[in-house]
Design a protein with these regions (language model features):
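Mobile, glycine-rich extracellular loop/lid and propeptide segments
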Residues: 1-4
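Sec-exported extracytoplasmic/periplasmic mature domains
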Residues: 36-44, 61-64, 114-122
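Extended non-globular C-terminal regions
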Residues: 138-139
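Mobile gating loops/cap/lid regions near enzyme active sites that modulate substrate access
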Residues: 6, 11-25, 41, 45-102
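Histidine-centered active-site loop/cap adjacent to the catalytic His
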Residues: 79-132
Length: 140
């Protein structure tokens, strides 16, 4: 389960009246806290919880490290990403992070999915590596 990113760090929040961004940051944080508490209270196991806020903050701070060229201008301009295809996108927007004021682009979704995949697969890689390391240490 992926929680909300910091909505206060979106182009929508940047274009909103003064004071809106901190409020949106607080609201997205409160939602994520309630989501986590609800998940814990449900007693359900086997559900991985991912908080994308640190990832989004890092992408916004260091976009080029992720292949992102722009984190402030939506690929669809002022339009909603709903119904905004390649023909409606602004030129050069394939490396933008936001499709519209709040929604991520295809590139952003790929970055997020890579992050989730690496988080889920890392424990198995460590498990595979540990016996190999023990074996190599034994024979050397």
């Amino acid at each position: 389960m992926i929680a909300l990113p910091d909505i206060g760090a979106t182009p929508f929040a940047a274009a909103a009246p003064a004071g809106t961004a901190p409020l949106l940051t607080a609201l997205s944080g409160a939602y994520n806290t309630a989501l986590q508490q609800g998940l814990s209270a449900s007693g359900t196991s086997g559900i991985a919880y991912f908080d994308p806020r640190p990832l989004f903050a890092d992408i916004i701070a260091r976009p080029s490290a992720y292949g992102v060229s722009n984190t402030t201008i939506p690929a669809c301009g002022a339009a909603s990403s709903l119904g905004c295809g390649p023909a409606q996108q602004i030129p050069g927007s394939s490396t933008h992070f936001f499709a519209d004021g709040v929604h991520p682009t295809a590139l952003a979704h790929r970055i997020i999915s890579d992050w989730v995949y690496s988080s889920l697969s890392a424990p198995s890689r460590v498990f595979i590596f540990s016996p190999l390391l023990a074996f190599l240490t034994t024979i050397s």
